Design a protein with these regions (language model features):
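Short recognition patches in nucleic-acid-associated and regulatory proteins
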Residues: 35-46
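Polybasic, low-complexity binding patches
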Residues: 2-7, 45-57, 65-117
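Short cysteine-rich loop/turn motifs with clustered Cys
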Residues: 9-37, 60-62
Length: 117
């Protein structure tokens, strides 16, 4: 497996952590139907890390599709930024590059403190 693929895929441990953080609900519409913790804030196509829980969120199929494929992406991303920065506070990113794969770097799965809610 290519190193980039390894780091952009979402490991089970990250999915479990994100599911718990988001309460098993779509963070955009609140539904519990068709929800999974497999949506990237920074998409895989832009080298978004899957091993960093701060880059992953729970979304239903509808909202995930809207985020990935609609002109509403910018507005949805603004909402996600608000949600994730609220959840992580000081552990939120200062630059989106923190959530992207960079060739030659070694990455590990980390757990970040987040606010309950």
């Amino acid at each position: 497996m290519h190193r980039m693929t390894h780091y952009t895929e979402i490991p089970k441990a990250v999915k479990i952590r994100v599911w718990e953080r988001d309460g098993g609900r779509c963070v955009l519409c609140g539904t519990t139907r068709t929800v999974s913790p497999n949506a990237h804030y920074i998409p895989r196509s832009a080298l978004g890390l899957g091993i960093d829980e701060r880059n992953i969120f729970c979304a239903c199929l509808r909202c995930h599709n809207l985020y990935d494929n609609s002109p509403q992406r910018r507005d949805i991303k603004d909402r996600l930024t608000g949600y994730l920065s609220w959840r992580y506070g000081d552990n939120w990113i200062t630059d989106e590059d923190e959530l992207k794969y960079h060739k030659g770097m070694d990455y590990e799965i980390k757990q970040y403190e987040y606010q309950g809610g």
